[in-house]
């Protein structure tokens, strides 16, 4: 059997170029050196012949046995003696007993360096560098995969920023639906929504706060879009001048108009701001049944007759006409407007200066040559009728 293994080994390793046998020293010390390196972790091309103190890296167990068998087969083939080859073949199995002592000695020699390296290795593994630490974003992703809510976790450091909560579309639909019916949630409903949507009460509360602020902002923007000037639409525009007319809010309050009777204006002024009767029939027609009582006087309102100068039937008993520049070609033979007995309260600034303009020598309807603007004090009992005194506001 020994011959067979010998010849097989020589056939397997015959292609190797072996060194000359003169360069090796054979002796009893030859069997001790491979045993010292059997369990070592060092790796080398061949089995070394030097002492363990200067030993180069060696192979592991399987490689070591193969190399030693290779070298022993080369030595035996070169020497040509079967006994030498058999002893070399038996060397690895026989040297299996001493490895304990030799390996322990080598372990003792290696212990200082090995202990230092072993101590350095745990130190390297225990040291955690900043880029190895787990960031909050990674922990959020992991917790989301596990189904946990990341907002409830306290941040790792005081400087870390809270990550925004990403709501799903289903959660947003439910929250918007709830906001449509109730802008403020009570506590039981909030708990119910939190259980339904798999959120926390704090998240739902914060979402509703943000949604209310968004709603208020939208309402403000809509309000500014509807009234760009910043005032309400029903507000009348300010008076820009003495001839500016504000009909809208003041024609309904004709009853409260106080009558101002200043000194009579000059009659032959150029044609401007004339008042045609057609311009007054529509806005003042609704004031027919109203009865006037002048402040401080006791004159009862009567219907005007056909000779009153204003021939339009719709305007009989209508309020007085305020004329800024009253243009009439009436002769001055009749009595003028002696209205000094009437009180003069503060007059509201109503000025109908936007009526239709007509030529300068036009009358206000078919008028008698003698006007019937009578003095209210002297003709009250004789005529049997009382005309309204026109309010003449000289502007």
UniProtKB/Swiss-Prot annotation:
Record keywords: Developmental protein, DNA-binding, Homeobox, Nucleus, Transcription, Transcription regulation
Region described as Disordered: 1-122, 135-163, 217-247, 363-395
GO MF term (any one): DNA-binding transcription factor activity, RNA polymerase II-specific
Motif (Antp-type hexapeptide): 128-133
Start-end of Low complexity biased regions: 71-122
DNA-binding region, residue intervals: 160-219
Gene3D superfamilies attached to this UniProt entry: Homeodomain-like
InterPro entries, sorted: DUF4074, HD, HD_metazoa, Homeobox_Antennapedia_CS, Homeobox_CS, Homeodomain-like_sf
Entry similarity comment: Belongs to the Antp homeobox family.
Job description of the protein: Sequence-specific transcription factor which is part of a developmental regulatory system that provides cells with specific positional identities on the anterior-posterior axis.
Protein name: Homeobox protein Hox-D3
Organism expressing this protein natively: Oryzias latipes (Japanese rice fish)
Phylogenetic lineage: Eukaryota, Metazoa, Chordata, Craniata, Vertebrata
């Amino acid at each position: 059997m020994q011959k067979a293994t010998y010849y097989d080994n020589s056939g397997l390793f015959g292609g190797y170029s072996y060194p000359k046998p003169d360069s090796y020293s054979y002796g009893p010390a030859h069997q001790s050196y491979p045993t010292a390196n059997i369990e070592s972790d060092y790796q080398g091309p061949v089995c070394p012949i030097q002492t363990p103190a200067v030993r180069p890296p060696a192979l592991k167990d399987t490689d070591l046995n193969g190399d030693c068998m290779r070298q022993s087969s080369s030595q035996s083939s070169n020497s040509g003696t079967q006994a030498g080859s058999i002893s070399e073949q038996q060397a690895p199995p026989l040297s299996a007993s001493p490895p304990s002592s030799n390996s322990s000695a080598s372990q003792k020699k290696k212990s200082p360096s090995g202990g230092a390296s072993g101590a350095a290795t745990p130190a390297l593994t225990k040291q955690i560098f900043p880029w190895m630490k787990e960031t909050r974003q990674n922990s959020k992703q992991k917790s989301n995969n596990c189904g946990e809510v990341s907002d409830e976790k306290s941040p790792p450091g005081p400087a870390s920023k809270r990550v925004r909560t990403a709501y799903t579309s289903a959660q947003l639909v439910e929250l918007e639906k709830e906001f449509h019916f109730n802008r403020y949630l009570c506590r039981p409903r909030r708990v119910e929504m939190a259980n339904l949507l798999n959120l926390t009460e704090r998240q739902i509360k914060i979402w509703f706060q943000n949604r209310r602020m968004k709603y208020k902002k939208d309402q403000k923007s809509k309000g500014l879009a509807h009234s760009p000037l910043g005032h309400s639409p029903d507000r009348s525009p300010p008076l820009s001048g003495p001839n500016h007319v504000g009909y809208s809010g003041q024609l309904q309050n004709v009853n409260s108009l106080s009558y101002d009777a200043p000194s009579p204006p000059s009659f032959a002024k150029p044609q401007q701001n004339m008042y045609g009767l057609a311009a007054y029939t529509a806005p003042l027609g609704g004031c027919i049944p109203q009865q006037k009582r002048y402040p401080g006087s006791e004159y009862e309102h009567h219907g005007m007759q056909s000779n009153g100068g204003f021939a339009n039937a719709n305007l009989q008993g209508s309020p007085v006409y305020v004329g800024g520049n009253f243009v009439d070609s009436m002769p001055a033979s009749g009595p003028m407007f002696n209205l000094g007995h009437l009180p003069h309260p503060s007059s509201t600034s109503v000025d109908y200066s936007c009526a239709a303009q007509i030529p300068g020598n036009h009358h206000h309807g078919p008028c008698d040559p003698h006007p019937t603007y009578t003095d209210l004090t002297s003709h009250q009992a004789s005529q049997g009728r009382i005309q309204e005194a026109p309010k003449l506001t000289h502007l």
